[in-house]
Amino acid sequence: MNTLFSPPSPPDNEQQLFECAQLLAGLSMGELAAKANLPIPPNLKRDKGWVGMLLEYYLGASAGSKPEQDFEHIGIELKTIPVDRRGYPLETTFVCVAPLTGNSGITWGSCHVRRKLSRVLWIPVEGEREIPLAKRRVGSPLLWSPNQEEEELLRRDWEELMDFIVLGKVESVTARHGEVLQLRPKAANSKALTEAIGVHGQPIMTLPRGFYLRKNFTAPLLARHFLI
């Protein structure tokens, strides 16, 4: 009979977190869920964040989807990323919710996107649909910080997208805007509206938005480190 797993305390440092993540490499979602006595959803359509929550549980993360990093005390964000058999990302990566009001004085240096991406523990997970969720395995972890070129690309896109928000043009932004960073609606249903600024500076109600990393940003990042 399997011994149930008790979630660890938050890691004391980066090395401890990385070693914990390495221990998960090669294990399947089914094995991890069984040890934690957690039910496995039939698929991820309604439980998009399930894989991330399962790995957070095993690594002692605490932030959930709050603005701070998952491991705020050691300055690290956890990002799971579904990949195909070649290690190529299968979808964009959610970074954080975009603030649609109260943005006076905000700069790249002080924004949530930069804080979240300053140090990331990437964990690739098998994500091809033909592999049943329970059989999908965890890949080797990677600790990453943006290099100068990556940071510049992110900053440029963030500033362009924030200009749309501040100037009341948030509803003009499409998925085509941004070279590596996208601004997209983030709501499970279209009735969940939030306040934003309209073209004439008036309050409007619109869908919540989130910042997402494009696959053309995460693919080379993974390829460089895993020599895909």
From Swiss-Prot:
A GO cellular component entry from the record: cytoplasm
GO molecular function, one term: DNA binding
Record keywords, A-Z: Cytoplasm, DNA damage, DNA repair, Endonuclease, Hydrolase, Nuclease
Taxonomic superkingdom: Bacteria
Signal peptide as annotated in the record: none
Cellular compartments annotated: Cytoplasm
Principal subcellular localization: cytoplasm
InterPro entries: DNA_mismatch_repair_MutH, DNA_rep_MutH/RE_typeII_Sau3AI, DNA_rep_MutH/T2_RE_sf, Restrct_endonuc-II-like
One GO term (biological process): DNA modification
Biological role: Sequence-specific endonuclease that cleaves unmethylated GATC sequences. It is involved in DNA mismatch repair.
Family matches, as NCBIfam families: mutH_TIGR (TIGR02248), PRK05070.1 (NF003458)
Protein's name in the database: DNA mismatch repair protein MutH
Encoding gene per record: mutH
